[in-house]
Each structure stands twice: as C-alpha cells, then as structure tokens.
C-alpha cells in the first residue's frame, strides 16, 4: 500500500519523509509545486484523499527524503487515466531534477513516456532489455514481454 499515516495531515505525512535530514531540492514548497492539489489539501488527513491523491502524497513523501533513486512499484495501478497522465508528466519532471526513477510497471504507455531503458523479467530471470522505443514496432516488441 501507500502507507499513509491515518492520524496525520497531508503536510505532516510529507514531513515524515524529511526525517532523514538529507538536504536536497525536495522541500515541502517544491512538492507543492509538483503536486498543487497537495497544497490545497495540506491540512486534510492523508487518508481522506482520493486514491490518486494518496499516490501523489506517497511519491511526495518519498521525494522529501531527497533520495538519489526512487523505486516506483506499479504507481498507476487502479488510477484513472487522467491521473496516470499527470503522474507521467510528474515523473519526467522529477527525473529532470536529477532524481533517478526505477519504475516497475505493466502500463506500456506510461513506460514509453517515462523510461529511457527497460528490463523485462519472467520468473525472476531477465528475458529482455534495451532502450525504450516508442515506435509501433518497438511497442510491439516490448508488449511481447509484458503479461497482464
């Protein structure tokens, strides 16, 4: 799950991520710039947010620790397409800020919008890897390795 702390507001949940004390570009104002809806809901309990907003909060909280790498495990699962589109844009902005993203995802349209390289696994073994190719041929080759 997203591990949103029920008794804490959106802002308090974000501040939990800063507990590492690591300095970097990700601060509460930077997260609010990335996710304006979180600023609007700053004093709302984190668990009162929609699923998409909770996912934004979870990503924002992870960024607050100013990591070199963020692991995103199926971050768009169960989310509306409009939220998936927003997250794709946000993931690209995060990467542009110098934070590496490791994306575990079956949504190929998201993969080709966000990833530069892919690695496909089956039963714990790597079965394919390479540069992400958004052409129809590249999508077909990538889709051959994804079972939903």
Q: What name fits each language-model region?
A:
Residues 7-26, 34-39, 43, 130:
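ABC-type ATPase nucleotide-binding domains, specifically the catalytic core motifs of the NBD
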Residues 84-97:
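Helical segment within the ABC ATPase nucleotide-binding domain
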Residues 105-106:
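H-loop/switch region of ABC-family ATPase nucleotide-binding domains
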